[in-house]
């Protein structure tokens, strides 16, 4: 990775923390610039600050956590932060008991075997002394939680059924949304199988900003706050988003500076050519960023965090997406269900 990809217009820039020569900036180059040491510390502080906001680990008996690794730069950063925090011997130590979950979306056997081989290499660098499990998103199709096996891809026998289910969805927008919901369902079932109630995911600020706009377009505007917050409680399961304040740019720079940018897993994903709300949202945000509206994502997330649903105050939630609703199922999920020829109620029961 080229150093010049992360630096521009350095003339006269000084670090906002220590007044050394500045070399790196976050999302908006018009704002704060940092020297290398202060930039690394700033990124670490954002990660730790997100976890401390909700006092997620205040109870000693609820520290078991599923840490998701998806092969992305954000996933590598998350592993690095957990690994580093557990090595601390002072008050800075993160009181968490991690289990690493490698989440696979590849469907071909040779690619899955390559992932398993690569994971064995990556494990030597991060969290070597904790349990690692590999699972395909198709694990969500199991009727009941099942025992996970190490050193192999769990859920692989359900891949054909998973592909058939997605193919049965006739509307590209709803197919994308179904994929997202199946992924969350998969994480919940995996957590149940491991008897864990918390799950750290790799969603960063860029991912969440796009998600917020997607959900607004899909009619879930009243539930945006719960979908982008750092901790989302769902009955006996909690989704934790510790990267919610960090952009992909900040994460990529950090990984480069800390020399962990060679611990990714390259997947051969083919970009879908189907037009959908999600692809249009992504194109819209990219256009704004190209036109130097750097704060678009931050503005979206800041606004989304203030929007709360007035329905479902009695604790009722949609059976598929878990947003607060007054009915058994939200209108968006009803539309997703109707666009599929397969019965989704069995999966999301």
Curated annotation (Swiss-Prot):
InterPro entries named in the record: CTU2, Rossmann-like_a/b/a_fold
Keyword terms: Cytoplasm, tRNA processing
Name of a matching Pfam family: CTU2
Gene: tut-2
MF (Gene Ontology): nucleotidyltransferase activity; sulfurtransferase activity; tRNA binding
Subcellular location: Cytoplasm
GO terms classed as biological process: protein urmylation; tRNA thio-modification; tRNA wobble position uridine thiolation; tRNA wobble uridine modification
Role noted for this protein: Plays a central role in 2-thiolation of mcm(5)S(2)U at tRNA wobble positions of tRNA(Lys), tRNA(Glu) and tRNA(Gln). May act by forming a heterodimer with tut-1/ctu-1 that ligates sulfur from thiocarboxylated urm-1 onto the uridine of tRNAs at wobble position.
Family, similarity comment: Belongs to the CTU2/NCS2 family.
The protein, known as: Cytoplasmic tRNA 2-thiolation protein 2
Record-level GO cellular component terms: cytosol
PANTHER family in the record: CYTOPLASMIC TRNA 2-THIOLATION PROTEIN 2
Biological or metabolic pathway of the protein: tRNA modification; 5-methoxycarbonylmethyl-2-thiouridine-tRNA biosynthesis
Main location: cytoplasm
């Amino acid at each position: 990775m080229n150093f010049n990809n992360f630096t521009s217009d350095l003339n006269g820039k000084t670090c906002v923390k220590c007044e050394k020569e500045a070399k790196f900036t976050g999302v908006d180059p018009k704002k704060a610039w940092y020297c290398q040491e202060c930039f690394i510390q700033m990124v670490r502080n954002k990660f730790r600050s997100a976890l401390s906001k909700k006092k997620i680990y205040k109870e000693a008996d609820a520290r078991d956590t599923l840490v998701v690794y998806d092969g992305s730069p954000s996933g590598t950063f998350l592993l690095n932060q957990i690994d580093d925090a557990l090595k601390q011997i002072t008050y800075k130590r993160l009181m968490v008991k991690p289990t690493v979950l490698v989440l696979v979306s590849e469907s071909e056997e040779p690619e899955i075997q390559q992932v398993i081989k690569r994971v064995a290499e990556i494990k030597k660098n991060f969290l070597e002394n904790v349990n690692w499990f590999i699972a395909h998103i198709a694990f969500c199709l199991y009727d009941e939680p099942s025992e996970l096996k190490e050193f192999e891809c769990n859920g692989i026998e359900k891949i054909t059924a998973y592909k058939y289910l997605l193919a049965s969805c006739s509307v590209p927008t709803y197919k994308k949304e179904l994929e997202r919901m199946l992924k969350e369902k998969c994480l919940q079932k995996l957590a149940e199988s491991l008897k864990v109630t918390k799950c750290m995911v790799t969603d960063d600020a860029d991912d969440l900003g796009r998600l917020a706009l997607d959900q607004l377009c899909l009619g879930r505007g009243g539930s945006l706050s719960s979908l982008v917050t750092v901790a989302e409680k769902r009955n006996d399961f909690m989704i934790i988003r510790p990267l919610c304040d960090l952009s992909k740019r900040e994460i990529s720079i950090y990984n480069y500076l800390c020399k962990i940018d060679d611990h990714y897993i390259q997947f051969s994903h083919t970009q879908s050519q189907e037009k959908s709300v999600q692809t249009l949202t992504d194109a819209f945000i990219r256009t704004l960023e190209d036109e130097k509206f750097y704060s678009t994502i931050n503005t979206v997330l800041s606004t989304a965090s203030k929007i709360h649903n007035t329905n479902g105050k009695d604790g009722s939630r949609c059976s598929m997406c878990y947003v607060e609703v007054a009915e058994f199922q939200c209108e968006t999920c009803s539309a997703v269900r109707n666009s599929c020829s397969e019965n989704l109620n069995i999966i999301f029961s």
